[in-house]
Amino acid sequence: METPLKAPESSLKSCNEPFSRTSEQDVATQELARQGEEILSQLYRPLETCNNSCYCKRCCYHCQMCFLNKGLGICYERKGRRRRTPKKTKTHPSPTPDKSISTRTGDSQPTKKQKKTVEATVETDTGPGR
C-alpha cells in the first residue's frame, strides 16, 4: 500500500512545480527591484571625496567622483577668490619729472630728434649700390 500512496504524492509535486517556478520568479523580480532601488539611492547620494591622487585608467574609473574629476576634468569645488596684491603707495616723487610722458610710459613713437638722426644716417650711408 505504501507504493500507491507515494505515486499520488509525486504527481502532486509535478503539479506544484510550475507554482514553485512562479514563486522563484517572483523572488527574482523582487531581488531585481531591490537592486534597482539600491542603484537609485546610490545615484542620488552625494559624492564622497576620494583621496586617491593617481591618474591611471583604473583609478579614473573606480568611482563617480574620480571619473568626474580625473577622467573628465570637471571639478565642482568652490575655488577661493584670489586676493589682489595691495597697491604700493609712493612715498617719493618720480625721479625723472623732466622727461616727457611718452618716454616714461614707453611709447614706441620716436621723437623729432630721433627722426633726424635716422634720416642723417640714411643720407651718409653711401655704400656700393645700384
From Swiss-Prot:
GO molecular function terms noted in the UniProt entry: RNA binding; RNA-binding transcription regulator activity
Subcellular location: Host nucleus, Host nucleolus
PTM field: The phosphorylation by CDK9 does not seem to be important for transactivation function.
Region (Cysteine-rich) residue spans: 50-66
Name this protein carries in UniProt: Protein Tat
Biased composition (Basic residues): 79-91
Quaternary structure and interacting proteins, as annotated: Interacts with host CCNT1. Associates with the P-TEFb complex composed at least of Tat, P-TEFb (CDK9 and CCNT1), TAR RNA, RNA Pol II. Interacts with CCNT2; the resulting complex is unable to bind to TAR RNA.
One cellular component (GO) term of this entry: host cell nucleolus
The family this protein is said to belong to: Belongs to the lentiviruses Tat family.
Keyword Ligase: no
Stretch list, region Core: 67-77
Ranges of Polar residues composition bias in the record: 11-28, 99-111
Entry comment, domain topic: The Arg-rich RNA-binding region binds the TAR RNA. This region also mediates the nuclear localization.
Superkingdom per UniProt: Viruses
InterPro entries tied to this protein: IV_Tat, Tat_dom_sf
Role summary: Transcriptional activator that increases RNA Pol II processivity, thereby increasing the level of full-length viral transcripts. Recognizes a hairpin structure at the 5'-LTR of the nascent viral mRNAs referred to as the transactivation responsive RNA element (TAR) and recruits the cyclin T1-CDK9 complex (P-TEFb complex) that will in turn hyperphosphorylate the RNA polymerase II to allow efficient elongation. The CDK9 component of P-TEFb and other Tat-activated kinases hyperphosphorylate the C-terminus of RNA Pol II that becomes stabilized and much more processive. Extracellular circulating Tat can be endocytosed by surrounding uninfected cells via the binding to several surface receptors. Endosomal low pH allows Tat to cross the endosome membrane to enter the cytosol and eventually further translocate into the nucleus, thereby inducing severe cell dysfunctions ranging from cell activation to cell death. Through.
Modified residues (Phosphothreonine): 85, 89
Residues forming coiled coils: none
